[in-house]
C-alpha cells in the first residue's frame, strides 16, 4: 500500500507539472525579467490586412536618427518571452525591431501565442498556412517601414521554424537588404532564383537534421547566382541563440550565441 501511495504521488506530480513544463514552450521567466527592466520603449500594435489582425511588438532603439527595421520571425514556440527579449536586444543594438505574432487570432477566443493551452503552440505554428505567414510578414514590414523612426532599410531574421520562414521570405520580398537565417531549412531550390538579398546562415554543429541541408543549399544558391554565407558553430545545439542565454546554458551554446551575435551585428552594420 505504501508503494502504491508513493507511486500515486509521483503520477500526480507529473500530471500536475505537465502544464507547467509544456507552457515553457513560450514562457521564459528570465527573458521576461530582462524585458521588464529594459529602458527602451516598446508597444503592441495591431497590423491589419486582408481581414486579419496581427498583433505585433515594436521595440524602438534609443536613437535620434532614423534606423533600419529588423523583422523578427519567431520560433515554432510562437512569439515567446525570449523572442520579445531578442527584439529588445536588437533595439539595444540600434535597430527598430518588429516582431509579429503569427499566431494572432489563432488561439482560444481569437487570442495569440500566450493564450494557447500548454503544448498547443508548436502544433498550431506547424499548421500555419505559408501564404498567410508571408502576407502577415509583408504587412508587418510595410507598417514598420512607414514609421517615422524607420530609415527605409529592411532586414529579416528568423529562428528555428522562423529561420526557414526568413529564408522563404527572401524569395518574395524584393526590398530586403539581407536575410539572417538561424538554424532553419531552406526554401525549394526552384524558388532561390527569386532571391535578391544576400542570405547569411547561422547553424549549430550538433543539429544533423538542419545541417544536412547546407551542402545542397550552397550549390542551389550558387547555381542561382545568389549570395549565401553559412557559418556553423561547433558544439552548439539547435536553438542556441535562446539556449545560450538561459541561466542553465552550456558553454558551447553560450559561445555560439556570443560569436553569432557578434557576427550578426557586424553584418547589420556593414
Where are the regions a protein language model picked out?
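Short alpha-helix in the alpha/beta-hydrolase fold that links the catalytic acid
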Residues: 86, 211-221, 230-233
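Short beta-strand/loop motif that positions the catalytic acidic residue
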Residues: 195, 201-203
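Serine-hydrolase catalytic machinery in alpha/beta-hydrolase-like enzymes
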Residues: 31, 35-38, 44-145, 242-245
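Short beta-to-alpha linker loops that shape the active-site pocket of alpha/beta-hydrolase fold enzymes
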Residues: 102-106, 185, 236
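Acidic catalytic loop of the alpha/beta-hydrolase fold
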Residues: 206-211, 238
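Bacterial N-terminal signal peptides
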Residues: 7-18
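Primarily recognizes the serine-hydrolase "nucleophile elbow" in alpha/beta-hydrolase
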Residues: 137-196
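C-terminal catalytic histidine-bearing segment of alpha/beta-hydrolase fold enzymes
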Residues: 222, 227-270
